[in-house]
């Protein structure tokens, strides 16, 4: 697992003007797109189809997250998000959450309920 590398390089290029976002944002109250049901990773095929249907997935869950999660997902979204931030600061309205925040958030019953519904919708596509 190489969790730190892609983010660390990008963080360094942002300079000190923008303090670390990790941990400074409040918990989001919407489900995130990091596909984390019960802490199990979805199959790579599922992730693949999610990338293909990214717009649809975003519409379904009504939230985006580019925090990197220890159990799954999301280096692509995170770096994509940070590239946008570098070219036009303030353009990214994503929540950047640390792995522990995401894990804690995804463990909440409310999220599991919402996530379950999303998975059912996704599987009917």
Curated annotation (Swiss-Prot):
Location within or outside the cell: Cytoplasm; Nucleus; Cell projection, Cilium, Flagellum
Pfam assignment, any one: DUF5544
Highest taxon above the source species: Eukaryota
Presence of keyword Iron: no
Keyword Nucleus found: yes
Region described as Disordered: 1-45
GO cellular component: cytoplasm; motile cilium; nucleus
Keywords from the UniProt entry: Cell projection, Cilium, Cytoplasm, Flagellum, Nucleus
Regions that span the bilayer: none
Function statement: May play a role in the flagellum biology.
Name used for this protein in its record: Testis-specific protein LINC02914
Organism, scientific name: Homo sapiens
């Amino acid at each position: 697992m190489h969790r730190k590398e892609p983010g660390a390089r990008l963080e360094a290029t942002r300079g000190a003007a923008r303090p670390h976002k990790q941990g400074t944002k409040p918990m989001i109250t919407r489900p995130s797109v990091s596909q984390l049901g019960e802490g199990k990773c979805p199959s790579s095929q599922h992730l693949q189809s999610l990338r293909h249907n990214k717009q649809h997935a975003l519409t379904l869950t009504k939230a985006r997250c580019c925090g990197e999660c220890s159990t799954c997902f999301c280096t692509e979204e995170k770096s994509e998000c940070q590239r946008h931030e570098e070219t036009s600061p303030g353009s990214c309205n994503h929540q950047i959450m640390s792995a522990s925040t995401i894990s804690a958030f995804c463990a909440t019953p409310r999220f599991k309920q919402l996530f379950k519904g999303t998975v059912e919708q996704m599987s009917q596509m």
